[in-house]
Amino acid sequence: MSRFFRGDSSSDSSSDEEEDLYSDDEEVQEQPEEESSEDDSEEDDDDDDDSDSSSDDGAGKKTGANAFLKDDSDSDSESSGDEGVKVVKSAKNKRFEELEATAKAIENGEKINDWGSISAEFDKLNRQVAKLLQSGTIPKVYIKAIADLEDFMNETLAKQKVTPKKMNATNSRGLNAVKQKIKKASKEHQKDIDSFRADKDAYMESEDEEVVAPKQKKPRSSAAQDVAADDDDEGWGTVGKGGRTLQFTPESILKHLRTILESRGKKNTDRNEQIKIMEKLYEVAATPYQRIRVLLTIISTRFDMTTGTQTFMSQEQWKAAEKEFGTLLSVLETSREYVVVETAEPWEDDEKLPTVAEGGKFAIPGSVVSYVERLDDELTRSLQHIDPHTAEYIERLSDESDLYNNIVRTMLYQEEISKDASLNEPQRSLNRVVMRRLEHVYFKPSAVIKILDENCWKAVPAELNSTITPRGSVEDAKTLVNVLCNYLYINTEGEGLTKARAMLCQIYFEALHDNYYKARDMMLMSHLQETINSFDVHSQILFNRTLVQVGLCAFRAGLVYEAQTTLQEICGSGRQKELLAQGVMIQRYNQVTPDQERLEKQRQLPFHMHINLELLECVYLTCSMLLEIPLFAQTGSSPDIKKRVISKTYRRMLEYHERQIFTGPPENTRDHVMQASKALAQGEWKRATEFIHSIKIWELMSKPEEIKAMLSAQIQEEGLRTYLFTYAPYYDTLSVSRLSSMFDLSDRKVAAIVSKMISHEELAAALDQVSSSIIFRKGVELSRLQSLALSLSDKASGLIESNERTLETRTQGTANAFERQGGRGGRGGNRGGRGGGRGGRGGISNAPRQAGGTQFTGGALGAAVGSRA
């Protein structure tokens, strides 16, 4: 159908348009060309002589503007005639066809990747559209060409970045030229391009709808009267597919819902339109049953809108779903005769509503627990994709209070329906919502939990109350967490995972609030460390977070050894981000599939739940320093104890720091700890304290001044131990008061530390209570030769064991595998095996060696050294 067959257009406007579109010469030349073409067709085709001549006469009679203003009867008669009818074309129509041909040429250039021709054709396209713009409308073909060309250009540029392939000079110049031209053109027509990309089919169909002629033309006056009548009409109706008007009445609600449910999951389903329909259905709903059914369906439809490329629910849709869910709970709370349970049978009769007996209840299939869980998950996904350092994250996080209110109301509703045994509602549903409530409070400080819970009860209707956490009975956050956890311990029969997660949440809460010994005892008595590998990934992440929090709690309590031991498994691995679900680690050698990467990102925790990794590293390195530096001094000449390593990560960092030729002032946390370690090893405990105190990260802890005071005391004590280990061989006696003045400790504290070292056989000395001095025993330290001899003996022993294992493997454990000639028996032979050289299992050994390398090793070497002494 020609694009110029428009209805409701006056002859005046048509004549004005014609004067602008084509000249008199075109009008005069067009008709002879048509006649000549008809004569040629008459000579070639003898069968259609009459029809051709008649059509030629008809075409010659109608010229000018009247040729384009045909009524329906003319168009019908022409369509029923011969298909060879020629239509006189205006200049505008010709230019439009030229525009389409140029756009087609650009598409052909895209297929062969010929950017030179694409650039030339795009210039031609811009010149052609400039003439068509005189009518005031932008051709949609032009908008489509710009959008498609821009997409193709971006795709080409992306491929060039991934797999660089050198273009020839012509293509390269053409691509650069098109890039500049497209940038300018898209900027001028950005609004139209966005409309085209939003819905391409609808955008292009709108043009076709504009050019289609109506079947009946009305005079301009009658059309104006119709518009006025439409303006006066106060009613409205929704037009569905095929132009049918949808009538929304209370009686038709169930039928409309049935139609929407049947179309769920199908392709080409407009969910936005379905939501609008259901919003109108809710307005006309007359009974609680209808409202409940509509709300259940509309919430499910909103959740379906997040499928596809979108990874999380938009804030607008989430707020709408949250509001509708709150409305659903309000309807269920006021209409107690209707309940929503998972085990209910659906109502199949759409013609009538169900009747509820007096005092009875009617069950509607659904799950309010699943809805509130989905709201929680969607909020978490949204927080995962928002930059946490922006105001948008804070604004989005404020929605958590509304979600918490709905979780509590859902818990109250599940408590109510769980009391009715006839509904057969499983206990698991109530446990799920209680667990959700616990997961929203366990990681928060007590003050925040108290405010959150108080505001929640203010939003809950006064007539509602809970049997698990009655209104006003929970005085503080600790009581709330204990009540929720104890309920899950009792009512999770057969749900080991839920019980384990509840225990981890309680341990985390206790550790967060500095109850170290209770958190430690619960962790040890639960034996979760033995079975955690069989749990799901989310539970393993929670276990890692709890373990880290227990370690931080031990550090705040001044228990350095316990803190380092607890944090060793997480911090020593170098994968803190991955283990705590606070970031995706870049795998250098392992190939990660897109699905694995997507799942890893889905497990990430929102930023407000993160544990500060810099603080965690600082605590771990500080504890390692306080343990490793005295150990370095103790193992100066003992190769046996040197094998003991507390933290490989710390030692690797310290060795790297010592290899540096020039060491500047500390810039980060790690540099501060390394330089403090170096100062502590040299006995400069005051300088080490200054380095540790200058770390800014301590300010993030609850009581930073107490933490710094505790660290000062620990550094003083470990500095004293390091000094005694290092300089003990050079003293005969040492006054306690001198040590007290050197390390700014009381005499009693120094005496206690020295006594502990002597009792643990770390120091070969005696404490004289009368003179308040330390008397060192001489001759117990190994010389350099003795240390090398012991090292050689250890290596020889290891070589013998390796040879024996190799021989046993080859001989498959036969009886004569270890027989040797010349009396050189095995471990019990003349040479005593490993025991003969060092007083081991097969030889004669002296008194057992003491820990710390302060006594002899026994055997021949020990006897020789002892005789000299």
UniProtKB/Swiss-Prot annotation:
This is Eukaryotic translation initiation factor 3 subunit C. The lineage of its organism: Eukaryota, Fungi, Dikarya, Ascomycota, Pezizomycotina. GO terms for molecular function: RNA binding; translation initiation factor activity; translation initiation factor binding. Residues 607-781 form the PCI domain. Residues 14-55 have a biased composition (Acidic residues). Residues 823-843 have a biased composition (Gly residues). The gene is nip1. Component of the eukaryotic translation initiation factor 3 (eIF-3) complex. Component of the eukaryotic translation initiation factor 3 (eIF-3) complex, which is involved in protein synthesis of a specialized repertoire of mRNAs and, together with other initiation factors, stimulates binding of mRNA and methionyl-tRNAi to the 40S ribosome. The eIF-3 complex specifically targets and initiates translation of a subset of mRNAs involved in cell proliferation. PANTHER family: EUKARYOTIC TRANSLATION INITATION FACTOR 3, SUBUNIT 8 EIF3S8 -RELATED, EUKARYOTIC TRANSLATION INITIATION FACTOR 3 SUBUNIT C-RELATED. It comes from the Eukaryota. It is found in: Cytoplasm. Residues 1-92, 182-242, 803-869 are annotated as: Disordered. It comes from Botryotinia fuckeliana (strain B05.10) (Noble rot fungus).
